[in-house]
Curated annotation (Swiss-Prot):
Primary gene name: GA20ox1B
Superkingdom classification of source: Eukaryota
Keywords: Iron, Metal-binding, Oxidoreductase
Protein name: Gibberellin 20 oxidase 1-B
Organism: Triticum aestivum
Coiled coil: none
Protein's UniProt keywords contain Nucleus: no
Length: 365
């Protein structure tokens, strides 16, 4: 087993940081990025209770946000506060375990699930200052999360699996509600995207960003657009999420009662480019660890990603070729490091494959 470079218990107190984690000038954080981005704070309680007027207002606000930068926050979402607290406690419980215990769930090369403490092996520079634990969640297999946690970490961690099984079930429910709003706002009807994602094969990720004594030299997560469809993020109270909009980086302030929602590349393709996936990153600090819970809604692996015909016409031709989520996921895990151009490069890669052209090496990305 290759030992990862990143051992939080050792590195978080060091005055210097290994060169693999140093980001070049121009990509590393700057003090002026602390300016707050005021994304819409959308109360979806009325919509969830079936109020037509509230639903129309939510639809309008979500549509405006998605055409601008693809980020918004939701409150009165129906997620139990105690479940949220349990989910955050379980993040602490896992990431404060000794490294050898966490490595029982070590992510294998080319896979998207498991424990990762750096991307060493695939990449040798601009490494993220974070640890993650990722696992699949499918409504059609309610035991999937618990079975994975017990199989990798042991029976002692069954409760952790049960907490995240409940959390993922609630995230899937909320995702489908948001998909109804997205469909309505795009004029394709509330049912279109909900049906597409009802059998979702999604990814749950626990993020842990340890303190760093040189926070202006590294990043917790580098600039990227999510290749998935929809991200529902719950931050702790530390802060660190930044979005690139109007030519500069700006921060989204954490709210305990809110989820941050953003559009991913796959949904950008499903909307024929109408709704945007936006560049974002995570910064770290020198004082305290930061935690976040990220649910990435994804379609079933072999479902064909294509926009509804009503979003395609002479004035709005197809922006991206057909693809499956499996092909995009494999692309990001084996060939390309997700960034701001993932969907563009992936689309060109698909066209080259279809034309039988020799594919260029992508390992440098």
């Amino acid at each position: 087993m290759v030992q990862p470079v990143f051992d939080a218990a050792v590195l978080s107190g060091r005055a210097d940081i290994p060169s693999q984690f140093i980001w070049p000038e121009g990509e590393s954080p700057t003090p002026d990025a602390a300016e707050e981005l005021h994304v819409p704070l959308i109360d979806i309680g009325g919509m969830l209770s079936g109020d037509p007027r509230a639903t129309a207002e939510v639809t309008r606000l979500v549509g405006e946000a998605c055409e601008r930068h693809g980020f918004f926050q939701v409150v009165n979402h129906g997620i139990d506060a105690e479940l949220l607290a349990d989910a955050h406690r379980c993040v602490d419980a896992f990431f404060t375990m000794p490294l050898p215990e966490k490595q029982r769930a070590l992510r294998r090369p080319g896979e998207s699930c498991g424990y990762a403490s750096s991307f060493t092996g695939r990449f040798a520079s601009k490494l993220p200052w974070k640890e993650t634990l990722s696992f699949r969640s499918c409504p059609s297999d309610p035991a999937l999360v618990v079975d994975y946690i017990v199989a990798t970490l042991g029976e002692d961690h069954r409760r952790l699996g049960e907490v995240y099984a409940r959390y993922c079930s609630e995230m899937s429910r909320l995702s489908l509600e948001i998909m109804e709003v997205l469909g309505e706002s795009l004029g394709v009807g509330r049912a279109h995207y909900r049906r597409f994602f009802e059998g979702n094969d999604s990814i749950m990720r626990l993020n842990y960003y340890p303190p760093c004594q040189r926070p202006m030299e590294t990043l917790g997560t580098g600039p990227h657009c999510d290749p998935t469809s929809l991200t529902i993020l719950h931050q702790d109270n530390v802060g660190g999420l930044q979005v690139h909009t109007e030519g500069r980086w700006r921060s989204i302030r954490p709210r305990a009662d809110a989820f941050v929602v953003n559009i991913g590349d796959t949904f950008m393709a499903l909307s024929n480019g109408r709704y945007k996936s936006c560049l974002h990153r995570a910064v770290v600090n020198s004082k305290v660890p930061r935690k976040s819970l990220a649910f990435f809604l994804c379609p079933e692996m072999d479902k064909v990603v294509a926009p509804p015909g009503t979003l395609v016409d002479a004035a709005n031709p197809r922006a991206y070729p057909d693809f499956t989520w499996r092909s995009l996921l494999d692309f990001t895990q084996k060939h390309y490091r997700a960034d701001m151009k993932t969907l563009e490069v992936f689309s060109s890669w698909i066209v080259q494959q279809q034309q039988g052209q020799l594919l260029p090496p992508l390992a440098s990305h």
